[in-house]
């Protein structure tokens, strides 16, 4: 059994997960928490190479099953090379996306079989699930508007998808929230960043048993 604490950050495009994480890190450091932050797909060399293939805007012909299997391959390598060692070392590991993204994007978004995705996630992770998942919820239109207004953000293949896909993805997350409400906590990402950070901090500290 791992000795650390695994947190995943989830949400539709433009929910602001990365900005919240950047604001949280100094707070955690003051608390003396040993933290590893990482992302999917990516996090390690092989994973980052797979990420480039998945998100390349020119790869418009990518089949949905190909996309899913690339994510799963990246997940496995990332887990064994980076995440599991950090958990064994007793660290707090915060992942920008994990298993729920596959269900939301490839399951609900692409229409692939949810049971097959669950099996692949189980196969890739040996059954590992986050201790806590923070789901940053935002209306699809607002999230995409944020992306369009952020000139510093690199546009990827998923950003170019139609509104319908993104709506299905959000519905997927809301379905997961209903199914696994004991693990997944919904955070209103439409609020000002400072409020979102404070809410996230409170939920995280409560989940880890840290004093606020």
Swiss-Prot record:
From what superkingdom does this record's organism come? Answer: Bacteria
**Residues binding ATP:** 11-18
This one is known as Thymidylate kinase
Sorted alphabetically, the keyword list is:
ATP-binding, Kinase, Nucleotide biosynthesis, Nucleotide-binding, Transferase
A cellular component term, taken from the record's GO annotations: cytosol
Which NCBIfam families has this protein been placed in? DTMP_kinase
| SUPFAM superfamilies hit by this protein | P-loop containing nucleoside triphosphate hydrolases (SSF52540)
- Stated role: Phosphorylation of dTMP to form dTDP in both de novo and salvage pathways of dTTP synthesis.
Pfam families reported for this sequence: Thymidylate_kin (PF02223)
């Amino acid at each position: 059994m791992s000795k650390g604490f695994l947190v995943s950050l989830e949400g539709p495009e433009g929910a602001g997960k990365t900005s919240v994480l950047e604001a949280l890190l100094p707070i955690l450091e003051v608390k003396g928490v040993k933290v590893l932050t990482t992302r999917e797909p990516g996090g390690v060399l092989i994973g980052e190479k797979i990420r480039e293939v998945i998100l390349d805007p020119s790869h418009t012909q990518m089949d949905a099953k190909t996309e899913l299997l690339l994510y799963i391959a990246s997940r496995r390598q990332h887990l064994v090379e980076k995440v599991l060692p950090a958990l064994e070392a007793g660290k707090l590991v915060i992942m920008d996306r994990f298993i729920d993204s596959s269900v939301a994007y490839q399951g609900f978004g692409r229409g692939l079989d949810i049971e097959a995705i669950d099996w692949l996630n189980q196969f890739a992770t040996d059954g590992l699930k986050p201790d806590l998942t923070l789901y940053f919820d935002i209306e699809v239109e607002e999230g995409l508007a944020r992306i369009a207004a952020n000139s510093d953000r690199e546009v990827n293949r998923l950003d170019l998808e139609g509104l319908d896909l993104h709506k299905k993805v959000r519905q997927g997350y809301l379905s997961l929230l209903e199914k696994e409400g004991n693990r997944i906590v919904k955070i209103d990402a439409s609020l000002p960043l400072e409020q979102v950070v404070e809410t996230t901090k409170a939920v995280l500290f409560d989940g880890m048993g840290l004093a606020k």
